[in-house]
A protein has these predicted regions:
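AAA+/P-loop NTPase substrate/partner-engagement loops
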Residues: 1-3
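P-loop NTPase motor domains
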Residues: 5-268
């Protein structure tokens, strides 16, 4: 009966870290920290640009992050020419991020202030960039507190910030001297593009409801809840998705139901 059919969604933010890694075909154990950082940064970018009362806190964090990246470049680059070239590359990338996400005048002014100290004469910056970074008005304590905040399993974040978060983490790693990080994560980033752009993943990207947590999702989609003693038969038509997406879908739903049952007491 067509009237009993509803569109199936599996919101991406309900995936745990290991499920993301499986979907992105991460082949190395050391790629796990990279993607964990991407998710954390994505959550913070979502907070920065959603325009609530916390945006000042997260903008301060973004400034702190940029300053640290530039500080690492200055510490590791051997010549002023190399330092300034790399620093201006970071500034250009950050400007692109801001223009893509939000016309934030505070961040734009911040980047312009740094860029004005990137002049070079006969291969010498005369310490202008270092002086500029040391004088920036950044609340260090607040930034460290923001940095310690963690994306909790099931918390909502906007997938549109994932690519931005990847860019920032890559910039951080390159500033620290990890010149092969893009090569190391190329498969993951290709799979991320697949998630962001492929119609096969639309059921993960464009859920009609923002669920508070896994239990909220299970109740709405499958009728699984403490107040419901019935056991409905749910059939998911997965004929239009690829085998890798089907494998992910099966794994995530099975894990959520198992975790839900594990939390129950007695005969529940």
């Amino acid at each position: 009966d067509e009237s009993n059919k509803t569109r199936f969604y599996l919101p991406y933010y309900l995936l745990n870290l290991d499920e993301w890694l499986a979907f992105l075909m991460a082949s190395e154990r050391t790629q796990k920290p990279f993607w964990d950082r991407v998710l954390q940064e994505c959550f913070k970018f979502y907070k920065i640009f959603q325009g609530n009362e916390d945006d000042v806190v997260y903008i301060n964090y973004f400034k702190w992050k940029i300053r640290n990246i530039l500080g690492d470049i200055i510490a590791k680059a051997e010549s002023d020419t190399t330092k300034i070239t790399a620093a201006q590359g970071v500034i250009i990338k950050c400007r692109d991020i801001i223009e893509d996400l939000s016309q934030n005048s505070d961040l734009s002014f911040f980047l312009n202030e740094i860029n004005s100290s990137c002049g070079i004469s006969y291969g010498d910056n005369h310490g202008k960039l270092s002086d500029c970074l040391s004088k920036l008005d950044i609340d260090e304590e607040a930034a460290l507190k923001t940095n310690s905040k963690r994306l909790k399993p099931g918390d909502y974040f906007d997938y549109n910030f994932l690519k931005t978060a990847v860019d920032i983490v890559l910039l951080e790693e390159e500033a620290k001297g990890n010149s092969r990080i893009r090569e190391f994560t190329s498969t993951m980033i290709s799979r991320l593009d697949y998630f962001l752009n492929n119609p096969d993943c639309e059921f993960m990207r464009n859920a009609s409801t923002n669920y508070k947590n896994e239990e909220d999702y299970l109740e709405d989609c499958f009728g699984i809840s403490n107040s419901n003693n019935q056991y409905p038969l749910i059939i998911i038509d997965s004929s239009e998705v690829g085998s890798d997406v089907l494998e992910l879908m099966t794994s995530v739903i099975s894990r959520m139901i198992f975790d839900y049952r594990k939390r129950k007491q007695g005969n529940d």
